[in-house]
Amino acid sequence: MRLSAFTVVDGAPLPARPVSDRYADVLGLADAAEAGGLSALWIAEHHFQPGGLCPSPPVLLAACGERTRRLRLGVLVSVLPFHRPIELAEQYAMVDRLTGGRLNLGVGSGYIPLEFEGFGVDPATKRERFDRHLETLLAALDGQEVRAEEPSARPVRLNVLPVQRPHPPIWIAVQRREAIPFVARRGASLALVPYATVANPEELAAEIREFREQLPEGVRAEVAVALHLYAGAQPGLAREALQRYLDARLATQSVFYQEKVQRDPHHADARAIEASGFALLGSPREVADRLRRFAEIGVDEVLGIFDFGGLAASEVQASVRALGDAWRS
């Protein structure tokens, strides 16, 4: 099982820091992930709200690529219903070229109401738009002839293709269990955020089994899960930061997540999430040992959310390096 880092470039909760400082934090996170031997750094795309300060992951991924040599770099996710897929294909092909073929391409359909409202996209159409845009995106990255949706558009081929052929590894993130068969049928890898969707690792294991059972014969796809991780001497400090993060998230996230919390408040309680096993806070050795449980249930990659709730960048980077060392030992 691989260990990676994942950031939403969180700007909440207050006191707010300058956006440029948060971008510098992400570059420092990339440095720490590379030094700590982690597999990848993944960055989320968000718009119009302080819970996510990266509206353009290709820009930030390219900056991280300039500072690293081995670390894979991923977006999780590119929100396909909001974008013109041919333009996305051009941007991510460039990132893959600039990084020497290190791009992981995670895609999703979006879930935050404000983002749909800001782009003028009807959430009822997101599944259909996702399917259509993904088909065009993959065809464009593969060098096939594609056509934009505007009536006056002519067929074109990209003049810059990714290093990885036919395209970078594709991951699809889902929040609802009923979407898992859709990912499996496509043969894509699956990304999950279990603290927001399931109650315990046993439920997560059931989702992973369901995914693998529905993959087409002969297809090898992977499962990644996002967990809040802190490896250091101040787990109490990290626990307080996690609760701040959860409080801010509840105010900005999807109706689905808010309804989930109403039915089961543990999804927004730091201690409950820690007790469920989806937040691992402790010494580097303790966290590394507890991570192995996820390998046993079929997880291929843990996406560690290290920079939550306003934790100092120095604390975050030390945690990443220490856990990376413990995981490899």
What are these regions (language model features)?
Residues 33, 37, 45, 64, ...:
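Conserved, mostly hydrophobic/aromatic
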Residues 1-68, 72-73, 168:
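N-terminal beta1-alpha1-beta2 module of alpha/beta enzyme domains
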Residues 9-23, 78-86, 164-174, 232, ...:
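Active-site mouth loops of central-metabolism enzymes
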Residues 5, 124-159, 200-300:
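An alpha-helical appendage that flanks or caps ligand/catalytic pockets
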Residues 3-7, 41-43, 73-75, 103-107, ...:
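Hydrophobic faces of well-ordered beta-strands that scaffold small-molecule active sites
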Residues 40-64, 79, 194-200, 305-316:
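Glycine-rich, proline-tolerant flexible connector loops at the mouths of alpha/beta enzymes
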Residues 84-188, 202-209, 213, 217-219:
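Internal, glycine-rich beta/alpha segment that forms the wall or movable "lid"
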Residues 20-32, 91, 174-181, 284-293:
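Short, acidic/polar
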